Amino acid sequence: MVYSYTEKKRIRKDFGKRPQVLDVPYLLSIQLDSFQKFIEQDPEGQCGLEAAFRSVFPIQSYSGNSELQYVSYRLGEPVFDVQECQIRGVTYSAPLRVKLRLVIYEREAPEGTVKDIKEQEVYMGEIPLMTDNGTFVINGTERVIVSQLHRSPGVFFDSDKGKTHSSGKVLYNARIIPYRGSWLDFEFDPKDNLFVRIDRRRKLPATIILRALNYTTEQILDLFFEKVVFEIRDNKLQMELIPERLRGETASFDIEANGKVYVEKGRRITARHIRQLEKDDIKHIEVPVEYIAGKVVSKDYVDESTGELICAANMELSLDLLAKLSQSGHKRIETLFTNDLDHGPYISETVRVDPTNDRLSALVEIYRMMRPGEPPTREAAESLFENLFFSEDRYDLSAVGRMKFNRSLLRDEIEGSGILSKDDIIDVMKKLIDIRNGKGEVDDIDHLGNRRIRSVGEMAENQFRVGLVRVERAVKERLSLGDLDTLMPQDMINAKPISAAVKEFFGSSQLSQFMDQNNPLSEITHKRRISALGPGGLTRERAGFEVRDVHPTHYGRVCPIETPEGPNIGLINSLSVYAQTNEYGFLETPYRRVVDGVVTDEIHYLSAIEEGNYVIAQANSNLDDEGHFVEDLVTCRSKGESSLFSRDQVDYMDVSTQQVVSVGASLIPFLEHDDANRALMGANMQRQAVPTLRADKPLVGTGMERAVAVDSGVTAVAKRGGTVQYVDASRIVIKVNEDEMYPGEAGIDIYNLTKYTRSNQNTCINQMPCVSLGEPVERGDVLADGPSTDLGELALGQNMRVAFMPWNGYNFEDSILVSERVVQEDRFTTIHIQELACVSRDTKLGPEEITADIPNVGEAALSKLDESGIVYIGAEVTGGDILVGKVTPKGETQLTPEEKLLRAIFGEKASDVKDSSLRVPNGVSGTVIDVQVFTRDGVEKDKRALEIEEMQLKQAKKDLSEELQILEAGLFSRIRAVLVSGGVEAEKLDKLPRDRWLELGLTDEEKQNQLEQLAEQYDELKHEFEKKLEAKRRKITKGDDLAPGVLKIVKVYLAVKRRIQPGDKMAGRHGNKGVISKINPIEDMPYDENGTPVDIVLNPLGVPSRMNIGQILETHLGMAAKGIGDKINAMLKQQQEVAKLREFIQRAYDLGADVRQKVDLSTFSDDEVLRLAENLRKGMPIATPVFDGAKEAEIKELLKLGDLPTSGQITLFDGRTGEQFERPVTVGYMYMLKLNHLVDDKMHARSTGSYSLVTQQPLGGKAQFGGQRFGEMEVWALEAYGAAYTLQEMLTVKSDDVNGRTKMYKNIVDGNHQMEPGMPESFNVLLKEIRSLGINIELEDE
């Protein structure tokens, strides 16, 4: 493999055996591509804003005399960039401007004569923009729009599986689901009549809808039934014979023709009989007259002489009717062909229960069902029915819906109209009847071919369309109302409804979620999440077991492991690593094409529907060097089942072993050795890991770490290759390579790093450079690490030396014993940043004021505030300290005589304001790291605000001028090159000031042109600098746009350093979680023969029952990796020659490595080898990909290479006594995470506090400063111990005995430790409730 200079710093040894045919795709593309489709100009008008505009415009007036047409749209530039939006608490959005054309037609002139055209650009509100990382900044917070998995539009055939009716009869139904519009359901009832429902309302006989479509009874029967023709010849009844129809029936009479008996009476008719009848070409047979009785006629029969109706279509024939028909000259009678087997009489039966008999009555019936209580008129009924399924404004199947609809009905074309046609409705009914007749299957609703993904772009477009439709109504009114000659398009459009619809979606939709920003993995996973909940989706309560379960079609599309535990299990899923959506929104996954038994590198993406037609081999099938399968029988999947196929039957092969799982699960090494339940916990807990102070790469990884770190966007990645020209903590400057420059630019890339910013979860976001001056970098190299990344790899936790052994009960029930060394070395120390805001409002009694002059507060409390009343940066504060002094005016109150006296003596006037300062919440302490002051436009800024403003201006100017200097330097080096090549002497040139270089003239015309071009660039650069500086200055000095009634907002940022302590939750990556029970002194920890103590002691009993053996393998492999690191470290300390070092490292990389993925150190320079060795000192990082990991033998080999016992167990000694433990203990390195469930956030105690209003019991929970619930079972415990007085105290004075509480307080103050329990308030509530039932209950005094 070829490595860039940066990648050579540390190479992960890969145990993967399968070649990487397809690189891991960009992990956020599902979000970015979808939103890109929404906002980019689409000339076809298929999707995005363009489609929304075209679907609503042109808007015509009611009279048709004028219309408003849509021409085009453009998105402006956002006012603030992403960081400014986050600081100011505003939405990162761009203004949408739409060019509209108002066309007014002449009234009297012929149609289409234009009187006037007015074109104008109209502002239509703001559209939130997506940041580069796939998030939205809404009101200053980062949010993610989660993709939704919903039922695809189309037609679905289903059954109730016999659950509806008591008899257990299976009832079939069909449902036509449009993208928008009314649902149409057809269903059978237990009597086998077919009914229809519209929008799940009450059911009507299905033939009503056919009558509404203008079909007569005859036509309806003609559509759904084959005919049996009887002829009366010579007073005998003959039947036209189609032999195939007789199969399986029992003959009720001798079937004979031409004197030959084919089937005797009472015999079952078999295929042999039918073959004979066909062979002899029998067309008619004579039947007894009784045979026709009970048959149903297919059309009306009229006596032609009198015009009298003898029998109507769908009537049952009787012998009397037959006689009548014969008399009136009808010799040929057509009846419906039905049987019990596969031609049921369902429609014929349904026509009988249908109360309507013509189109009008059917329309009226539908109108009554849809609008009960309204009197139907013909016009209203017709327009209602027309609008239900046949109007493009009200009904749309969408391209997906039409495709699914036509495929389901086995039609050839997959495109068509978005509305229903007569044929559509009839074909659905026909297919439903076929299924009832036993032909065809019902659909599997959980098949991923029937569920599609709706991503950000599509949902935003739908919301936008909703807004436009609201505007459309208003525009129609305006066009009809008034004087069109003076009106312009912008007078017609009110942007409010559009803004409101978009704002509502991004701000408060169920699928617009507060981004989970614990660490880079949680960000990526959140953006790749797929939810079945949300508008138009399922609800938790209604979702059954089937929907939540893993389905065979999830393979390679949706992860079978990563899903929440709890009520949402299976409803919220995660996208698999390689999955993507196709044009219709269905998930597809890549496969390698197999041609004639040879696996090629050609890649096809298949959706769940297409996949069903192929045989697909697993990724771990063994291939030879030409790509042939080694085994004759290959394990494959076909139609959702796994079985063995011969190698020439195989069509496709999986791309990668990690194709099945999601990003989160693909980060668990040895996942294949973990039980699925624990793997689920492991994948979920990685997302809760808090970024530690110093990130530490996992010794045992899976090779996915780099992809996650880079794609998450927390690292700074080089856009173009070049050389590092300048680097400090907050900025990296790259001089771009010549071949990657755009013509006529300075060739300098500047990366500003994020420093100590707060994330959504209050963790700390901080970027640190990982390149040094003069290093070459290539495009895609990581320049700076973000939170939880180490040299461009995801690093969620720390590598800890663990031992599996019991230790004095301190690891009972998954508790974890931790060494003090872990605390000393700050291995799990995390920084948390909290934002506290103080808002100064304009109240009825006057404005609130931010000031240091606060009534009744001592000097000590004000010591950390400046003269404006705002805390200093760098101040260390604890719970209760004032951060921002604020006073609120209060109304004049009646003064007590004492207060009057005091005021008379001291002239104190401060009592008309009350203290409403911002204080540090209880239990929080930390350091103030930043203060932001926002002042409303037109309100005078205080001193602190001006200081901050001045500081920001200085910083902005410094940043920009440094940027200018860097760019100037780059430009002048190019000017110098031109001048020198044009004949100017270098020495003389260097003596001349740089500004004068551009005054020189060159004789070579081409060089002179180049020089003039560069001079122009220089002027442009300076002009650009002035412009940028001015813009920055305007932004900084401009007042802020605050909510109505708010004068000022002060935001204070507190940084808290949290060390690990008992009560914190930790976990490995295999679902092995626990709580720290004790921090043990280093000298008491078990140690090995070299005197090295372990860091963590885990309980061995946590492994067997949970079946997550991956943790043990990880521990062994981690030990081997560390052992190799130790040997490299020893070699470096002894300063052995590079050749030896190179040879040893090469041996380690070659061990168990596949030929295709060899690391060749011979291409590395000595310096590069030394630097690699330096980075391998703490252990050689290892990748063991999911389902393709290290084998047991390979781990043993690696342990041997690191001079460690191959059992992975060593002898330990007790740190307290020095005695040897009685058997060897498994010791190794496991990657441990500290989860965001910290004891500091959960610890809580209360003496007195707030009480609930009705029951007068203390509130619950830390947020309400509540008490501990002493529940039913606790009461039983005290009863069992006979602790009556304690129990009385718990139920009265410590809970809801109001008088007793007050008395007790007084007694304690007086030093009298007595209590007088009274009546608990909740008993009084009970009395009141009983009285409200009309039962008078009184307490009698003894």
From Swiss-Prot:
Entry's Gene Ontology BP terms: DNA-templated transcription
GO MF annotation, one: DNA binding
Uppermost EC category: transferase
UniProt xrefs under Gene3D superfamilies: 2.40.50.100, 2.40.50.150, 3.90.1100.10, 6.10.140.1670, DNA-directed RNA polymerase, beta subunit, external 1 domain, DNA-directed RNA polymerase, subunit 2, domain 6, RNA polymerase alpha subunit dimerisation domain, RNA polymerase Rpb2, domain 2
InterPro entries, sorted: DNA-dir_RNA_pol_bsu_ext_1_sf, DNA-dir_RNA_pol_bsu_external_1, DNA-dir_RNA_pol_su2, DNA-dir_RNAP_su2_dom, DNA-dir_RNAP_su2_hyb_sf, RNA_pol_bsu_bac, RNA_pol_bsu_CS, RNA_pol_bsu_protrusion
Pfam families hit by this protein: RNA_pol_Rpb2_1, RNA_pol_Rpb2_2, RNA_pol_Rpb2_3, RNA_pol_Rpb2_45, RNA_pol_Rpb2_6, RNA_pol_Rpb2_7
PROSITE patterns referenced in this protein's UniProt entry, alphabetically: RNA_POL_BETA
Catalytic activity: RNA(n) + a ribonucleoside 5'-triphosphate = RNA(n+1) + diphosphate
Cellular component annotations (GO), alphabetically ordered: DNA-directed RNA polymerase complex
EC number: 2.7.7.6
Protein origin, superkingdom: Bacteria
Keywords: DNA-directed RNA polymerase, Nucleotidyltransferase, Transcription, Transferase
NCBIfam families noted in UniProt: PRK00405.1 (NF001616), rpoB (TIGR02013)
Record note on quaternary structure: The RNAP catalytic core consists of 2 alpha, 1 beta, 1 beta' and 1 omega subunit. When a sigma factor is associated with the core the holoenzyme is formed, which can initiate transcription.
Physiological role: DNA-dependent RNA polymerase catalyzes the transcription of DNA into RNA using the four ribonucleoside triphosphates as substrates.
Record-stated family: Belongs to the RNA polymerase beta chain family.
Protein known as: DNA-directed RNA polymerase subunit beta
